[in-house]
Amino acid sequence: MRYYDAEMRYLLEAGEEFARAHPEQAAMLNLDKAGARDPFVERLFEGFAFLMGRMREKLDDDLPELTEGVVSLLWPHYLRTIPSMSVVEFTPDWPEMKEPMTMAKGFEVLSRPIGEKGTRCRYTTTKAIALQPLSLERVQLATDTDGRSVITLRFTCSQLTDWRRVDLSHIPLYCNADAPLACAMHEAFTLNVARMWLHMPDEVDRRPLDGYFSALGFGEDDGLWPEDGRSFRGYQLLLEYFTFREKFMFIDLRGLETVAFPAGLAWFEIDVVLAERWEHDFRFSEKHLRLHCVPVINLFPLESDPLTINSLQTEYPLRPMRVQDGHTEIYTVDSVISSHQQVYAPFSSFRHKGGMMRHDAADYYYHTRVRRGPSGLYNTWLIVGGEAFDNHTVPEDESLSLTLTGTNGQLPRRALQSTVLDTVMKTTSASIAVRNLCAPTLPCYPPAQDRFHWRVLSHLGSSFLSLMDNAEVLRGTLALYEWTDSEMNRRRLEAILDVKHRATERFAQGHLVRGVQIEVTLDSHGFAGRGDICLFGEMLSRFFALYTDIYLFNRLIIILQPTGERLEWEEKHSRRIPG
């Protein structure tokens, strides 16, 4: 519209100049009368403005035909929507449970009806979760006799529990609070634990517990959305950090597998003694540390309306079957099969004829492209090809059946009230309640300005050490993954003051090991407390470990200004080649 409006303004201004220079001709066209213009001239102006606006838009679009093809084949996550996400809490009927119940990855949760049509948004869990016959009854912060801060976790147990069938090697917990408190809790549990004690009802004194808390969300199996085999894990880690930091507010309680719990146990307590005192003004309770929580994402299976194709047309718009509600969008095309049982291979797999498989492969392939429509929705187009299309031998009655993954788009946040997730999709043997602990996020779309695709190609062609040249390069690299326009994310990036690196060597088991020591100077005022800084540093350390050359290790050191405090991370080794 801005191109069209600009052309219309130009034509109106040019018409006024023409009327002053040629009043007789202007009178014949009514150009000199602003309120009574000739309707045929108006239509001519509008048509010319539309055509020239389209031409100007094409000149300004930075040749997406070149960049989108390369980016979609090598790094498809840069072109995909990041759907709405949230964190849900399952509440089983734990007093009646005898053993854990596992909720598989992809378990569906529905929202209450929202919007004019009463649509229920469908969310799926991003990882499996074990519902234990436990309840976290109380979380209390107190001071020990020696002046140290102690966090007491009291778990209530089902007295029907068969402890031989319960695996307590890890118990995930979620820090359910605003960012400053959640980050402070996360830091206290993962970086500030001095010792742990266990107390059970029949014991007079508490006993030492060889346990600890570890940070969750950084593992290869912790991705929020489906990974493409072509995508580099480190890039997804950055996108997840900037778009849904709640994912990293999970911690894992470890060490209880060594404890022999007696039958009929009613409760047990764990005292977590902190190495440094809890100096924050805010307190927390069991409302802020939750059990049986898992992230969910607004993705669900769909089918497309059948497509009738011919060899003369290669692009087709896709529409979800029976879903014309004005908000459902297609996330991915998972499979394409023709009415003659011909399987179409994804073009990116290079398993079609002429690709890596040469002559022993499918004759057909498909590719997808996303374009933003006039309504604001992102529409998916299917592009088909192969030898049959090149030779025009596609059967006339050929139709395609497609399996899709869809999303509800912006509907979860368009409702006047916050969307509530409170219904499980599948029935289970036990009674389970569910609720969302945070408001569903808005979907994030790839940036469409500032030559984004060209910046992506420039970044992905750089080496690991080039990121460490200066603070501006690192800020620019991280900004490629900040799609939310969040003020807090902008402040975190601007807080990067300086970046230095130097080579380091050490001997390990008789071998010389080479690495890189990276020093990042941060302005502490750009973060919501020390816990926020530690989470940012952990993200950087993990990303550098994934991105670094395979023969190097890296060690991150963060220097805080204005205090000059140094935070050091353990050295990490690359386990795969980025790309």
What are these regions, as identified by a protein language model?
Residues 158-361:
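Short, low-complexity Pro/Thr/Gly
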Residues 24, 342-579:
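C-terminal domain/tail detector
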Residues 110, 265-275, 398-405:
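Short, aromatic- and glycine-rich surface loops/edge beta-strands on solvent-exposed regions
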Residues 2-3, 10, 22, 47-58, ...:
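Short linear motifs embedded in intrinsically disordered, proline/glycine-rich low-complexity segments
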Residues 144-146, 263, 395:
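Surface-exposed coil/turn segments at beta-strand junctions on protein surfaces, enriched
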Residues 1-203, 217:
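Extended assembly-interface regions of large multimeric machines
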Residues 51-59, 77, 138-148, 154-167, ...:
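Extracellular ectodomain segments of secreted/surface proteins
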Residues 1-25, 29, 218-261, 267-269, ...:
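Mixed-charge (acidic/basic) macromolecular-recognition segments
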